[in-house]
Amino acid sequence: MTRVALAFSGGLDTTVCVSLLKEEYGYDEVIGVTVDVGQPATEFEEAQATADAHGIDLHVVDATAEFVDLCFDSVRANATYQGYPLGTALARPIIAESIVSVAKAENCDALAHGCTGKGNDQLRFEAVWRNSDLTVIAPIRELELTREWEQEYAAEHNLPVQAGNDGVWSIDTNLWSRSIEGGKLEDPNYTPPEDVYEWTADPATTTETELITIGFESGYPVSINDNAHDPVELVETLNEVAGEHGVGRTDMMEDRMLGLKVRENYEHPAATTLLNAHKALEGLVLTKDERDFKRHIDSEWAQKGYEGLVDHPLMDALEGFIDATQQRVTGTVTIKFEGGQARPVGRESAAAAYSADAASFNTSSIGEITQQDATGIAKYHGYQGRIANAATETDTK
């Protein structure tokens, strides 16, 4: 008996895939796998209902803790891609690994997903899956199916498809972000209606302000207002608190890996808050040279994270540098929520690379260094440029 493990949500794509894997690919049994990375409970209920109607076994894997751990690694790397905090991208390798584990435990011959041939997720899933000895199947891509064809196929075969949000938008939710795309949003000039947002209040209507303090240890968020939280609880709390102030909305034209531009809307209140706080603490603790060089490292980490290549050998090297810098990133940051913003307004650390006395306008010297000692440096500063400019002026006369 041949058996295939399908990444299963209960939506149109994966529901159609169940039938296609049997009819077109000849598999005897399809096993559905749904991985919990912080989706709403209704999504699991819908997946189970669809699986039951299809008569297939559904395995639900809780990978929430592993996912948030990876998100916290991304905080240490200040990781965003074109301005958004990588929630969807980071979830995919976690989901893919979980599906491989189930497939091996259930003696499956193959792995399957319902991704199209136009998106990023096919690449992220398969980057993980092709490390296994299992066959990889992508029915939607391989059979070149369209959404319209799938809808007709489901209707003709009376397939159980959960309505979800009635197909108005394509929505993907996890603890780190909520993405909204498709439908009228495919028009770059279309203004999203306020009801597409669920996590964040309208920033234009939020009038209250609130201060919170976030604690970090070695670059990892560990507390809110001096109360320790486990990673999952900390993110859940900040999503609620920051979301009430309208924090964490992104409306962007995203450049996908295949070269396509796509209109995306994201909500990510906790991610925005933690990234802003972490950058503020690094600004207090790290030297200028460390901060300048780390920007390059962070950018590479974010790119690999966006591509779903979190196990790439380069990531080990990047993590080595990041880990070395983060040993001193311990302290607290005060964040002010106001008008859709999460703004750092205070930071404190025993490892601060900062001297209030040295920076003060009320002191004339720094130890043995006086203000007059800067005169020689000031004379040399820009000297090469002045010579070059003078030579250019001479040549043009």
UniProtKB/Swiss-Prot annotation:
GO biological process, one term: argininosuccinate metabolic process
Binding site for ATP: A7, F8, S9, G10, G11, L12, D13, T14, T15, G114
GO terms assigned for molecular function: argininosuccinate synthase activity; ATP binding
Top-level EC class as recorded in UniProt: ligase
Subcellular location: Cytoplasm
Domain of life: Archaea
Catalytic activity of the protein: L-citrulline + L-aspartate + ATP = 2-(N(omega)-L-arginino)succinate + AMP + diphosphate + H(+)
GO cellular component labels: cytoplasm
EC number(s) given by UniProt: 6.3.4.5
Keyword Membrane: no
Main location group: cytoplasm
InterPro entries in UniProt: Arginosuc_syn_C (IPR048268), Arginosuc_syn_N (IPR048267), Arginosuc_synth (IPR001518), Arginosuc_synth_CS (IPR018223), Arginosuc_synth_type_1_subfam (IPR023434), AS_cat/multimer_dom_body (IPR024074), Rossmann-like_a/b/a_fold (IPR014729)
Assembly and binders: Homotetramer.
HAMAP family (alphabetical): Arg_succ_synth_type1
Stated name of the protein: Argininosuccinate synthase
